[in-house]
């Protein structure tokens, strides 16, 4: 369960009134505050307040791991103001065939104002996290801390930091030779070194897919991939784990920028 979001970007009573324009099935579906579509709205508002998804940038996707069909994936659309997004604006995709089951363009026009919604350009990257890491959610932000770190490490292929307490919030992952899957074996410890791969940006988001997949395969211990001069992708086994990992990593990235400016090494030598 999550704490209620207190940000006031959207009038809740107005949103409830608009639900009446939906089919009875969708009205019932969206009444659940923990429905993936509602959680995406909640997190988008929170992330907007953190300056992570401004100017329609960034995106969130959640796989319905607790629902009757864990292959259903809800994805926020492209080009919308994330702090004002509504649950009926999500694209619904079913894995593994990536079949689109529902789009916001199917919703009554009185709700969408005849706006032509487009699938998120992040979709193939989100899908990569689900298929390669069995993730329950994937978050993409345009965090300034993420961008700055990739600039400080302009000629590097990875970011590393150690001996910081916040590292404990992140999972310790290991490749299982028998199952062929990445498994969580615990949490990282204070002395551990966090390593996050950095991939180069491309003119179009979907063109990042191959590089992201390669980074995920080459860094089995990572829960995120930095995109140079762009932002970061973070995933977790549930939406709340992904949220925690994203917050912890952003804290570490912000701290890393300050440490760099102060001339303090990010990786402590034993």
UniProtKB/Swiss-Prot annotation:
Q: Does the keyword Zinc apply?
A: yes
User: What's a Gene Ontology MF term here?
Assistant: methylthioribulose 1-phosphate dehydratase activity
Reactions listed under catalytic activity: 5-(methylsulfanyl)-D-ribulose 1-phosphate = 5-methylsulfanyl-2,3-dioxopentyl phosphate + H2O
Q: Where on this chain does substrate bind?
A: 122
Enzyme Commission number, as recorded: 4.2.1.109
Q: What is its main location?
A: cytoplasm
GO biological process assignments: L-methionine salvage from methylthioadenosine
Q: Which cofactor does it need?
A: Zn(2+)
Does Zinc show up as a keyword for this record?
A: yes
Comment on bound cofactor: Binds 1 zinc ion per subunit.
In terms of InterPro entries, this protein maps to: Aldolase_II/adducin_N (IPR001303), Aldolase_II/adducin_N_sf (IPR036409), MethylthioRu-1-P_deHdtase_MtnB (IPR017714), Salvage_MtnB_euk (IPR027514)
Pathway assignment: Amino-acid biosynthesis; L-methionine biosynthesis via salvage pathway; L-methionine from S-methyl-5-thio-alpha-D-ribose 1-phosphate: step 2/6
Q: Where is the catalytic site? A: 165
Could you tell me which SUPFAM superfamilies the record lists for this protein? Answer: AraD/HMP-PK domain-like (SSF53639)
Root EC class: lyase
Q: Which residues are involved in binding Zn(2+)?
A: 140, 142, 230
Query: What is one term from the GO cellular component aspect held by the record?
Result: cytoplasm
Extract the PANTHER family matched here: METHYLTHIORIBULOSE-1-PHOSPHATE DEHYDRATASE
Family assignment?
A: Belongs to the aldolase class II family. MtnB subfamily.
Name of this protein: Methylthioribulose-1-phosphate dehydratase
Q: What is the lineage of its organism?
A: Eukaryota, Fungi, Dikarya, Ascomycota, Saccharomycotina
- UniProt lists the gene as MDE1
């Amino acid at each position: 369960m999550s704490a209620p979001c207190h940000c006031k970007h959207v009038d809740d009573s107005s949103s409830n009134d608009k639900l009446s324009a939906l089919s009875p099935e969708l009205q019932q579906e969206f009444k659940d505050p923990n429905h993936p579509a509602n959680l995406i709205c909640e997190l988008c508002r929170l992330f907007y307040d953190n300056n992570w998804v401004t100017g329609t940038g960034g995106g969130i996707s959640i796989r319905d791991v607790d629902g009757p069909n864990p292959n259903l994936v809800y994805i926020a659309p492209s080009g919308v103001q994330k702090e004002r997004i509504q649950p009926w604006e999500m694209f619904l995709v079913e894995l593994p065939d990536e079949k689109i089951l529902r789009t916001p363009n199917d919703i009554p026009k009185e709700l969408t104002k005849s706006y032509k919604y487009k699938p998120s350009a992040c979709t193939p990257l989100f899908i990569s996290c689900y298929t390669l890491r069995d993730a329950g959610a994937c978050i993409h932000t345009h965090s300034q801390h993420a961008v700055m770190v990739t600039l400080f490490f302009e000629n590097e292929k990875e970011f590393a930091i150690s001996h910081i307490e916040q590292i404990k919030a992140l999972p310790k992952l290991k490749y299982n030779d028998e199952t062929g899957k990445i498994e969580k074996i615990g949490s990282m410890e204070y002395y551990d070194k966090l390593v996050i791969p950095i991939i180069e940006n491309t003119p179009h988001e979907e063109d990042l897919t191959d590089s992201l997949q390669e980074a995920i395969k080459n860094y089995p211990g990572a829960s995120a991939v930095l995109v140079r001069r762009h932002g970061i992708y973070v995933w977790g086994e549930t939406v709340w784990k992904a949220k925690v990992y994203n917050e912890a990593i952003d804290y570490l990235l912000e701290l890393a920028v300050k440490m760099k400016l102060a001339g303090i090494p990010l990786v402590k030598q034993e």
